[in-house]
UniProtKB/Swiss-Prot annotation:
Region of interest: Disordered: 303-329
Domain of life of the organism encoding this protein: Eukaryota
GO CC term, one of those recorded: proteasome regulatory particle, lid subcomplex
Keywords, ordered alphabetically: Proteasome
InterPro entries (alphabetical): EIF3F/CSN6-like_C, JAMM/MPN+_dom, MPN, MPN_RPN7_8
Cited Pfam families: JAB, MitMem_reg
Name the UniProt record assigns to this protein: 26S proteasome regulatory subunit RPN8
PANTHER family: 26S PROTEASOME NON-ATPASE REGULATORY SUBUNIT 7 (PTHR10540:SF7), EUKARYOTIC TRANSLATION INITIATION FACTOR 3 SUBUNIT F-RELATED (PTHR10540)
């Protein structure tokens, strides 16, 4: 019985190893480097914790011609078992940046080295866009709606980068070195917001391109993807034109809907700003009240100290007077 995997977690060490492999071998433009990934695939979450490089060659013109050193895989796998027995061979990686025609055949080859279905990890070593430079795939049998025979295809799995405590310290130091020290906190936040919006725009463009290909019959209908897109659309706020049953909506109705949307967003923003203003006002009043209370306590303590000091002075004066009286007698 095969285990269903939900997502993939990747250690930062693996990304650095793939990048080092690509730079060290001086891979030409258009070619890719290939290696093996190690980790744990016994749970719903696949953990990729280590990797090693492989000698790999392929023909650029003919995707069916490629070379992979089997003996090297077996010897390196045995050596890795001696170093860390918990890390198993769970799949392979290449520097992409996209899937290739020969990936399914190479993936079938790795089946004899893995306990289950091998994982394919694509690491884009020259990524310019926002987001993680990784994509994880697992080969599955796709059942067609027209009743024809099934065929092998890659199923995309969501990826995250997770590090152990020791790795987190190294990554934090690395980010501290590459971060611009002259940039302030506000500029960093604005830059991150801009990158996030660019990433969102790219994702939306990908969705539009996919839907257009489905409409033009360039891609088959995938009900799972369409269901997830519908879930996303259902999460959008309905702040515009509500008369969905009115098919003959005029341009004036659209303008009114746009104005309603702007008005709703403005009201919501003003409400949030009012909450922030009231919160700051309450904080200032509490701080002012604490200041007054502190001054009153300080004044009270000062008066008590003055009384104690005056009592000590009176006591000393009385003792001095008694001493002088005794000396006179």
């Amino acid at each position: 019985m095969s285990l269903h995997h939900d997502n993939v977690t990747i250690a930062p060490l693996v990304l650095l190893s793939v990048l080092d492999h690509y730079e060290r071998t001086n891979t030409p433009e258009g070619k890719r480097c290939v290696g093996v990934i190690l980790g744990d695939s016994q749970t719903n979450t696949i953990r990729v914790t280590n990797s090693f490089a492989l000698p790999f060659e392929e023909d650029e013109k003919n995707s069916d011609v490629w070379f992979l050193d089997h003996n090297y895989i077996e010897s390196m796998n045995e050596m890795c078992k001696k170093i860390n027995a918990k890390e198993k061979l769970i799949g392979w990686y290449h520097s992409g940046p996209k899937l290739r025609a020969s990936d399914l055949k190479i993936n079938e080859l790795f089946k004899k080295y893995t306990q289950g279905n091998p994982l394919l990890l694509i690491v884009d070593v020259k990524q310019q866009d926002v987001g993680l430079p990784t994509d994880a795939y697992m080969a599955v049998e796709q059942v067609k709606d027209d009743g024809t025979s099934t065929e092998k295809t890659f199923l995309h799995l969501p990826c995250t980068v997770e590090a152990e405590e020791a790795e987190e310290i190294g990554v934090e130091h690395l980010l501290r070195d590459v971060r611009d020290q002259a940039a302030g906190g506000l500029s960093i936040r604005l830059t991150n917001q801009l990158k996030s919006l660019k990433g969102l725009q790219k994702k939306l463009n990908d969705i539009v391109i996919y839907l257009n290909k489905v409409i033009n019959n360039e891609l088959p209908v995938n009900h799972t993807i369409l269901g997830k897109l519908q879930d996303v659309f259902n999460l959008l706020p309905n702040l515009g034109y509500n008369e969905e049953t009115d098919v003959s909506a005029t341009s004036n109705d659209m303008v009114t809907a746009s104005n309603n949307l702007q008005r709703a967003l403005t009201v919501k923003t003003n409400d949030e700003l009012m909450v922030i203003y009231i919160t700051n006002l309450v904080r200032a009043i509490i701080a002012f009240d604490d200041l007054i209370e502190n001054k009153m306590q300080n004044k009270k303590l000062q008066e008590e100290r003055n009384k104690e000091l005056q009592a000590d002075i009176n006591k000393v004066e009385s003792e001095t007077a008694e001493t002088e009286k005794v000396a006179t007698d």
